Amino acid sequence: MSLKSIAKQALSLMDLTTLNDNDTDEKVVTLCQQGNTLFGTPAAVCVYPRFIPIARKTLKAQGAEQVKIATVTNFPHGNDDIDIAVAETKAAVAYGADEVDVVFPYRALIAGNEQVGFELVKQCKAVCSANNVALKVIIESGELKTAELIRKASEISIKAGADFIKTSTGKVPVNATLESAHIMLETIRDLGVADSVGFKAAGGVKTTEEAEQYLALTAEILGQDWINQAHFRFGASSLLANLLATLNDEQVNQNVTGY
């Protein structure tokens, strides 16, 4: 595939994201407008729950209702209070989210507690299932660090009902890496759940060339045909400008953020 073809594919697989403490309605409106490109739209926009209504209104106004709205819960710290995670997930669904990205209680897993992660994901999944909302589970691979823990968090999340497993919050020093993606994609393959579970690389994917590496890795493990909006996403914000530059034959200036 040409770099332009890859850029266009990556754009269609993006969860175009703003998760900053200084987010405003205006910034979310701008994000939604930026995603409405001459080369198509992203799979989703990802915003804090309180911005779901303005995102919905903006997407509708620009005729981009096919773009899903994702949000985050138990974010970003991945605490182990199941009741709070479930309450936040219920609130996100009530705001109108199409997809919820919940943070797995990764510190509890590092400390040896596998059960709380399973229960938290299972209960959040029950809320989502009842409302036809997809659940993505952020395992925070850069904090888990070891292949063993990354695989374990992926397995627990999948067995508890995750629709996607996602690398990172974008709020820690190490976010998506090809190494962690490799382990997560192999876990999806090895558990035989490729039909029902997807993968999301989030944080740190900033260029068309980097996106290409993730797409190539995924194709190698799960096949080219597996790569579609139902199975694969990039969680990103600064990636969009680079993809558009590739598509427009322009040079791009890198703006550096965690996402």
From Swiss-Prot:
Its EC number is 4.1.2.4. The active site is at residues 101, 166, 200. PANTHER family: DEOXYRIBOSE-PHOSPHATE ALDOLASE. Gene3D superfamilies: Aldolase class I. GO terms for cellular component: cytoplasm. The keyword Amino-acid biosynthesis does not apply. Signal peptide: none annotated. GO terms for biological process: 2-deoxyribose 1-phosphate catabolic process; carbohydrate catabolic process; deoxyribonucleotide catabolic process. This is Deoxyribose-phosphate aldolase. It is an enzyme of class 4 (lyase). It is found in: Cytoplasm. Disulfide bonds: none annotated. The gene is deoC. Catalyzes a reversible aldol reaction between acetaldehyde and D-glyceraldehyde 3-phosphate to generate 2-deoxy-D-ribose 5-phosphate. One of its GO terms (molecular function) is deoxyribose-phosphate aldolase activity. Pathway: Carbohydrate degradation; 2-deoxy-D-ribose 1-phosphate degradation; D-glyceraldehyde 3-phosphate and acetaldehyde from 2-deoxy-alpha-D-ribose 1-phosphate: step 2/2. SMART domains: DeoC (SM01133). Keywords: Cytoplasm, Lyase, Schiff base. HAMAP family: DeoC_type2 (MF_00592).
